Amino acid sequence: MNYPYEDFLDLFFSTHTDPLATAASTSSNGYSLNDLDIDWDCDFRDVIESIMGDEGAMMEPESEAVPMLHDQEGLCNSASTGLSVADGVSFGEPKTDESKGLRLVHLLVAAADASTGANKSRELTRVILARLKDLVSPGDRTNMERLAAHFTNGLSKLLERDSVLCPQQHRDDVYDQADVISAFELLQNMSPYVNFGYLTATQAILEAVKYERRIHIVDYDINEGVQWASLMQALVSRNTGPSAQHLRITALSRATNGKKSVAAVQETGRRLTAFADSIGQPFSYQHCKLDTNAFSTSSLKLVRGEAVVINCMLHLPRFSHQTPSSVISFLSEAKTLNPKLVTLVHEEVGLMGNQGFLYRFMDLLHQFSAIFDSLEAGLSIANPARGFVERVFIGPWVANWLTRITANDAEVESFASWPQWLETNGFKPLEVSFTNRCQAKLLLSLFNDGFRVEELGQNGLVLGWKSRRLVSASFWASCQTNQ
């Protein structure tokens, strides 16, 4: 995507804000953007012209196709977001909010492009982010302004992390754990984004182990174990099959994720055990600590006669980031257990290793613009709960994703390729049941009309918002397993 020189400069000098403004961020050179006293009409233009002159081809990045996934037209065509980008931007006579939205999109993409690649320039990135911080804040009235504020903050954090002069000055936003959990629960009430994966995976598990007396779930990333309470309730209340099915969960944790992650897994076990006791569900819980990202079945306690289920939730909100090599190690070893079911749930974010950072950035912007639009349809920006969720939960979520997509191309994969990887590495697809499809549609009926469920082959379901796919769930078994 190319940016005409004059058009790009004009993006900085709109009349939306006070021309004398500062931005709250720390630059890559070790000084705060708050220290800048910039006259946007004079000094700032000189800075941009100087940097662009020095960098030469900075504003002519390598040609990359903008994500046009799943037959979508443009980045987002919602009036609330004001975002509509395909291979360029129409400079007709858009409404004021739409015009500002287009400017913000171009500035975000320009900042992302300036921060990476062969022609990366920290100085140019710094001044673009300074302008963005002047134009937006998380408390603005439109979706696009608020979304741009979160992406600007995320890009600023990346700039700080990359600084070689002041790495010690970088600090991530830290929120009280109770606030984070509250925001997460509010998000679950606002959107089916998280519960879609939980619901479809749990239903598939119930169907797969219907006649099993002992069930062993190996959970790749248990987090708070939210989905397992509902599974226990269903096991206790079901009228068919063994009257007292024993459930055992093995939760993995990795030393690479730190002591906090290990403690969280242990606390999850205590909560699940207490809940199982309260409803009379036979239950046991094991914590499997891995010293590295590599997984070996020898680290598991296996009991003869148990039906093994593999649960793999990848990079959903509140889940820790795991490298592709870690996921491959886990799934490869899990295959040797001849699992009766493998549940795979992941976000539909395009992270193609053969595409550059700019492609991945645009697709991520597309993903979150759809999320913001879906939230707006159910809860207006004026609602304090919406602002709380955005500040405490969605902002850090955006920042974490930006960190992931800046990884070396060798460590970046398309999550859409995981089903293909399973099918070519000893797993077979399991058909989604009619009941599971109906339950997914019933879940969506509790929310706004823009959500939809799409079948992904015979063994998968996808949650979408209008034309954008958001989260997919697919179901598999070992080729050696008799169904």
From Swiss-Prot:
Subcellular locations according to the entry: Nucleus
Residue ranges annotated as motif VHIID: 215-219
Transcription regulation found in the keyword field: yes
Stretch list, region Leucine repeat II (LRII): 267-299
Domain GRAS: 95-477
Record keywords, A-Z: Nucleus, Transcription, Transcription regulation
InterPro entries: TF_GRAS (IPR005202)
Any one GO cellular component localisation term in the record: nucleus
Region spans: SAW: 403-477
Principal place of residence: nucleus
Top-rank lineage group of the source organism: Eukaryota
Free-text function comment from the UniProt entry: Probable transcription factor involved in plant development.
Family designation: Belongs to the GRAS family.
Record protein name field: Scarecrow-like protein 26
